[in-house]
UniProtKB/Swiss-Prot annotation:
Biological process annotations from GO: endoplasmic reticulum unfolded protein response; ERAD pathway; regulation of retrograde protein transport, ER to cytosol
Protein known as: Probable derlin-2 homolog
Pfam family, one: DER1
A single GO cellular-component term on record: endoplasmic reticulum membrane
Gene Ontology molecular function terms on file: signal recognition particle binding
TM segment ranges: 18-38, 96-116, 119-139, 147-167
Cytoplasmic face of the membrane: 1-17, 117-118, 168-254
Species assigned in the record: Dictyostelium discoideum (Social amoeba)
InterPro entries assigned to the protein according to its UniProt record, in alphabetical order: DER1, Rhomboid-like_sf
Disulfide bonds: none
Superkingdom, taxonomy of origin: Eukaryota
Keywords assigned by UniProt, alphabetized: Endoplasmic reticulum, Membrane, Transmembrane, Transmembrane helix, Unfolded protein response
Lumenal side: 39-95, 140-146
Amino acid sequence: MAQPFEDWYKNLPIVTKIYMTGCVVTSVSVYLGLVGPLRLYLNFPLVFGKYEFWRLFTNFFFYDEIGMNFFFHMYFLVRHSRLLEESSFRGRSADYLFMWIFGSFLLLIMDAFLFYTKIVTKVLFLAPSIAFMVIYVWSRRNPNMHISFLGLFTFSAPYLPWVILIMGYLFNHDLTTDLLGAVAGHAYYFLEDAYPLISNRRLLKTPGFLKNLMDGQEQPIVDAHQQQEVQQAQQQEVQQPVQNFLNEDDLDQQ
């Protein structure tokens, strides 16, 4: 039993592996009482008034205490993050890490704006937002993939974020964190994919130190035939029903 999990974990791409590990360690620490959620959540008065700067970082690593809701979030996130990192970011782990950093900064800026303008004051953890950003970018990068919903109907991948939002609305969940993630994901998609086609200029450039940091960590770039095989394998995977992801627990916002 341990060996298959060890092999699965070992084969995870580097950025997905690091983030998943950080989330698991954080939630286990909370479960064991080593740290409380009150020490992790995002609180701007404490950040800037009490200099508790770690909150800008830790709020991205806590979804929930160990339980079904946590495992649903982890499975959904790791699945799509791995698909994204192994396909359009294959051989470009530094670029993928930069996407996460860009999204995190943008989410912090948006959350600070909402907090200080008193539009929304209860976004305590941005982990669901960063996960939704990953799902959004994956969906836009895979327009030809199809997803089966409960075996009743299928839709193309770009509609996945909106299906999740609609389900959240039907279950009367707060959609703030998901909407923030959608904005961050679309901002990255526009600046990285759409804007260069319009202007022939690229605004987002991965810093050299990140490339040096990730040197040797990237998965090898595959040729066109191998890339097609990877995409076909991923197509088969995303054809699986998504009922495990679109239920009430999975859409629960922290």
